[in-house]
Amino acid sequence: MSDDKSKALAAALAQIEKSFGKGAIMKMDGSQQEENLEVISTGSLGLDLALGVGGLPRGRIVEIFGPESSGKTTLCLEAVAQCQKNGGVCAFVDAEHAFDPVYARKLGVKVEELYLSQPDTGEQALEICDTLVRSGGIDMVVVDSVAALVPKAEIEGDMGDSHVGLQARLMSQALRKLTGHIKKTNTLVVFINQIRMKIGVMFGSPETTTGGNALKFYSSVRLDIRRTGSIKKGEEVLGNETRVKVIKNKVAPPFRQAEFDILYGEGISWEGELIDIGVKNDIINKSGAWYSYNGAKIGQGKDNVRVWLKENPEVANEIDAKIRALNGVEMHITEGTQDETDGERPEE
């Protein structure tokens, strides 16, 4: 570059920094880049691996969508529990007015430390979310759900009034404001969304999500969660078999998927995932019905091994760390937010 061009560029950069602050523009030479993307674990080892970076990326928008009773809120509460365990501060914007503190506590959420808002309108919910994000004091915000973000005009209007595109415009405007603040404050914002059917679709999937297209574009990660079956013991149903597909991923390759069990009253079966993924990665050895680790037998049958791992959390954490290291997705947590319980699952 010639001297004249260099001087002109230096003057322009100085003017930008003077007007908008230091760091408003920078060279991508590596010195200013984050060495590792900070993430918050989903509470599911398989999903952390499928995401390619070890969890949900901070400073980004994530959308989790699926049919009713598929595990959307459970997955979010598991992530909240993981964030709190590492010293994070979380907020839950409950637009559906259906938050269950008893269930959340069973999943390991410290309910007394969780900030809960139950707004009256969609505008109020998104304004609360924006204010929390801009404060810089929140690590994770969950909005449950986009479908329940009802515009004020619709609430104040009469039943049967037409309000075409109001919610989509509301979401589009809010996300334009939120995106920059989310990146600057390194906050994770998770939107839970529902599925609707498009009428008259002959080819392709008739399914779509609520709130227009803005959330699809602004989301760095989109997760499609589905219930694939039931977990039974005799005639008693103990939980759901769940599959999550990574539909969109801006931080790693997309279209991967994870399968795990959600047990009623317990949440995601982390120990069950350790067994399945551990066997797949040759960290746990399986011979017939017997499972062994480091040459020592740890149980006969998956259920017995699951119980054994619950009783021996230090071994479970060791297996988890080995699986993450083998797959190259070790979590990078903000310095200074970890506490002495890091790596341990919340006890029931």
UniProtKB/Swiss-Prot annotation:
Gene Ontology biological process terms in this record: DNA recombination; DNA repair; SOS response
Secretion signal span: none
Domain of life: Bacteria
InterPro entries associated with the record: AAA+_ATPase, DNA_recomb/repair_RecA, DNA_recomb/repair_RecA_CS, P-loop_NTPase, RecA-like_C, RecA-like_N, RecA_ATP-bd, RecA_C_sf
Result, substituting I138V: In strain: P63
One GO CC annotation: cytoplasm
Alphabetic keyword roster: ATP-binding, Cytoplasm, DNA damage, DNA recombination, DNA repair, DNA-binding, Nucleotide-binding, SOS response
Main location: cytoplasm
Residue positions binding ATP: G66, P67, E68, S69, S70, G71, K72, T73
Function summary: Can catalyze the hydrolysis of ATP in the presence of single-stranded DNA, the ATP-dependent uptake of single-stranded DNA by duplex DNA, and the ATP-dependent hybridization of homologous single-stranded DNAs. It interacts with LexA causing its activation and leading to its autocatalytic cleavage.
UniProt similarity note: Belongs to the RecA family.
Protein name: Protein RecA
Organism: Neisseria meningitidis serogroup B (strain ATCC BAA-335 / MC58)
Gene name in the database record: recA
